[in-house]
Curated annotation (Swiss-Prot):
InterPro entries: DinI-like_sf, DNA_damage-inducible_DinI-like. It comes from Escherichia coli O157:H7. This is DinI-like protein Z2083/ECs2153. Gene3D superfamilies: DinI-like. SUPFAM superfamilies: DNA damage-inducible protein DinI. Pfam families: DinI. The lineage of its organism: Bacteria, Pseudomonadati, Pseudomonadota, Gammaproteobacteria, Enterobacterales. It comes from the Bacteria. GO terms for biological process: DNA repair; SOS response. PANTHER family: DNA DAMAGE-INDUCIBLE PROTEIN I, DNA DAMAGE-INDUCIBLE PROTEIN I-RELATED. Keywords: DNA damage, DNA repair.
Amino acid sequence: MPHRYPAAKINKMPKGSVPALQQEMLRRVSKRYDDVEVIIKSTSNDGLSVTRTADKDSAKTFVQETLKDTWESADEWFVR
């Protein structure tokens, strides 16, 4: 389940936060999907890709909501 996060936001993130975000997303998404891979890439545009699932719309909505919750709760899980 590849995931891309906006380059502008990634470039402004503290050192070490991209791997931490990837691990936290993996932890959260794995609760719903057994065989999951989370990939965070720095790109020039916003995008979210969800692949290898029967119900892509449902999976994409779940991942978007999970990403939003994860991003908003960074103070709780990101240790610098």
